[in-house]
Amino acid sequence: MSDLKETRLEKAQVLKKLGNGPYGIRFEVTHKAAVLQVEHQDLANGQERQLEVCVAGRVISRRVMGKLAFFTLSDESGSIQLFLEKATLEEHSDLDQESPGSFSQLTDLVDSGDWIGVNGILRRTDRGELSIKVFSWTMLCKSLQPLPDKWHGLSDVEKRYRQRYVDLIVNPQSRKTFRSRALMVSAIRRWLDERDFLEIETPVLQSEAGGAEARPFITHHNTLDLSLYLRIATELHLKRLVVGGFERVYELGRIFRNEGISTRHNPEFTTVEIYQAFADYTDMMDLTEEMISFVCSQICGSTTIQYQGKEVDLTPPWRRITMHELVLESTGLDFYEFGQDISKASTAMQSVGLNVPDHADSVGRLMNEAFEQAVEGDLFQPTFVMDYPIEISPLARKHRSKPGIVERFELFIAGRETANAFSELIDPVDQKERLLLQQSRRQAGDLEAHVIDEDFVNALEVGMPPTGGLGIGIDRLVMLLTDSPSIRDVIAFPLLKPESGSQ
């Protein structure tokens, strides 16, 4: 045990004997720090206002000068200075210096990091700092761990993620990020609800992990002796709801994929999936740019923002261009000219310095590889990349006029995929054929290939109206709107590799 922790434990025992904590039950709060700062800006230097307030929070800093002390108290809204005077405390409490709540207890037993509640009136110091002139105080929680140095904060980035509770105390930007995230989620739900979309929850535990090309987490139900999977998408169940007659439906929730971890990927993440009957992928483009621009204006106050030193303009309309056009523009390769000649397409890619992966077994997959290598990272302004190869889009409807292509788009902002959408495939025969092809890939070793969900195919056989479907990555959108470089900055408790020596 560290000397500092031992000292704080001793102080906690003293407080307990004196009857002042160290762990309070409740405290009646009348005002928040930030509200006081705003509502009493007119209070002149050196003046007091006879408004009695009760404020609670964490002591962030303390300065003791004989019979006078200045503490900074922080609550969820902000911070305010405490003006603590020995004579004032004694005058209002009639306590001797050994009694609970005395000035000596305050200066001797209260440390930075402790939670206290105070009662007093407002006073602006001669230097212009709005303060609470404290009449009485109560210990609410004794902190046994010292806070990081206020000048250097929590400088170890990984420690910020492992001890988010400390990060939130010492880093105002982290608090702002998670507040913005909560407001963003609320704004998305409000926007959808106002347009008659209904949020319905679908299963997290599933007998088949479908709806995306991803490896699932596997668990086991003991009573049923049944292997189950954490969902990798909400798509197939939401489509079942459209079959059942819900014409506008969505779900905002957690997704789980047993994949790598990076600044863009966390195995547990959040999406919103939206389905609209009688719509196609062009309608979903309209919906996407309208909703995201609305959310951006709500959170950032404008549709023009800064991300990592560059300006991003989210004002609609956004650029719409096909994958084929982008690859041709960037590499000079016209993949439509290759037909089904994989060898010719591979040679052409190598001639312009692109890698040809072993798993690319079709021209469509090679075009997608060329896009990912040569184009994707440069799409900084919002861009709808349209018309994807059918081989990589088994749940999307065939394009109405382009063979080998489906009506699908992905939205790219700041070089990252942010949304994915289709004109949904509603032909049950076509759907089953494509899932059988996916099954063949799976049997050949592709563990991310789709599985066949027979009940989903059965639902399509019951009949699903023409539908547009959309999925948006909430975490990546929060990254964009809060200017955060890593997905770990916007997930309160991201998954991390265990520290060395821990179990």
From Swiss-Prot:
Keyword Hydrolase: no
Compartment(s): Cytoplasm
InterPro entries for this protein: Aa-tRNA-synt_II, aa-tRNA-synth_II, aa-tRNA-synth_II/BPL/LPL, Lys-tRNA-ligase_II, Lys-tRNA-ligase_II_N, Lys-tRNA-synth_II_C, NA-bd_OB-fold, NA-bd_OB_tRNA
Obligatory cofactor(s): Mg(2+)
Major enzyme class: ligase
Gene Ontology cellular component terms for the protein in this record: cytosol
Organism domain of life: Bacteria
Documented EC number(s): 6.1.1.6
UniProtKB keywords: Aminoacyl-tRNA synthetase, ATP-binding, Cytoplasm, Ligase, Magnesium, Metal-binding, Nucleotide-binding, Protein biosynthesis
Positions bound to Mg(2+) 2: 417
Annotated binding of Mg(2+) 1, by residue: 410, 417
Gene3D superfamilies: Bira Bifunctional Protein, Domain 2, Nucleic acid-binding proteins
GO molecular function: ATP binding; lysine-tRNA ligase activity; magnesium ion binding; tRNA binding
Chief place where the protein resides: cytoplasm
Catalytic reaction equation(s): tRNA(Lys) + L-lysine + ATP = L-lysyl-tRNA(Lys) + AMP + diphosphate
Short name of any one Pfam family annotated for the protein: tRNA_anti-codon
A Gene Ontology BP annotation from the UniProt entry: lysyl-tRNA aminoacylation
Textual note on the cofactor: Binds 3 Mg(2+) ions per subunit.
Subunit relationships: Homodimer.
Similarity comment: family membership: Belongs to the class-II aminoacyl-tRNA synthetase family.
Annotated protein name in UniProt: Lysine--tRNA ligase
Lineage of the organism: Bacteria, Bacillati, Cyanobacteriota, Cyanophyceae, Synechococcales
